């Protein structure tokens, strides 16, 4: 009996040492990579701390152009849906425990879609004088959308020579043509989603203004399975001309993206589910962002997933149908930009559906805004130090790749998932001085309660977080009122531990 107890104790000690070494080695490596790169190099000094003695010759020209763009953007009645609140009444269905909600299988719903298609007839008269995809009708079972032939301008888009391949992925290929970007889609589901989303947006009054920061299609062709968009120079991920001098511009850009997400969720009842730096396309003039749009709707889903989407296409006379797929928490957002609360559920219950966490438009909206906060976190690191940001991003992606490659049944996947959360908590703590005392402690408490076997290691990490100093260079951002608002946005979105809770105002009122 004594030998069994000693063996069990020895096994427990070995297990503790294993987890302790795992956490401490990774944390030490990440901390060293950051601390060794907190001093500004010459390139960073030029980017982030402009010298008044050597101003750029085009400075006045750039400032004039930026002010002109800003004045033009602000003269319209822009949306300011930046206060996301949720009713917490006991009668709300969102109050139920997400782990106890029945998850309707996508197979059963696909069978229902097939049955619905047999019942729906095409109203050919509705195509007359139709110029854009338009909702025809909506029932408890389906939403009917008509797509006209005129809208799919093959002569201008599909038949144009493809000048250059911009990129290729699992969803299709993107080419640059004379009229913009044409994307060849491999699957029907994405082109159906694009048609439905456009029909949903244009039914909102004043959609041209509200959707100014959403990348919507210029043309959809069901015959060639292509979608055409306006061309943008780059995306936020590859943007590397960050400057503290442009903080007002960056804060204004993220404010516009917040309005776009609120419009998409609160007015169009659509969740993006893939907000990331690579999906935010921008036009720039040196360090200034002139225009930014949120694109890539391959994971975009309607809040009410029970209705089938049926497309009547004038091009080939066929009726196409699609139903919402079951988006699990692990299949939404890129892991680097996944909200911390969502990452916690990935570690504890990876098969959970997002519809079990969010039931109302405001809850889906908070989830998308939290992902945008993660984008702002890595973006702001570039303002502090280019080398620091590169080190942090390299460390994050290496850990995240290990997490994604691990098999579901492997215990290391949970360990890497915890490490992802800890890294994110540490970065936000070093970026926002008051974050840990306000919100970070509650996340650490949840981790300790969920994984009591790691309690000693997590307590050690908790102590480190409590004593951690801000990144060198944060003070420069804090001294700027626009930088302070940007850090507040990061802190608020990172501290969300339940999408049902009110997020509150995420930016102060925009003043021109």
Curated annotation (Swiss-Prot):
Query: Which Gene Ontology terms cover its molecular function?
Result: ATP binding; protein tyrosine kinase activity
Which PROSITE patterns does the annotation name? PROTEIN_KINASE_TYR
User: Enzyme class, one word?
Assistant: transferase
Write the protein's name: Phosphotransferase UL97 homolog
What residues make up the catalytic site?
A: 274 (proton acceptor)
**Per the UniProt entry, what are the Gene Ontology biological process annotations, in alphabetical order?**
viral process
Q: To which protein family does this belong?
A: Belongs to the protein kinase superfamily. Tyr protein kinase family.
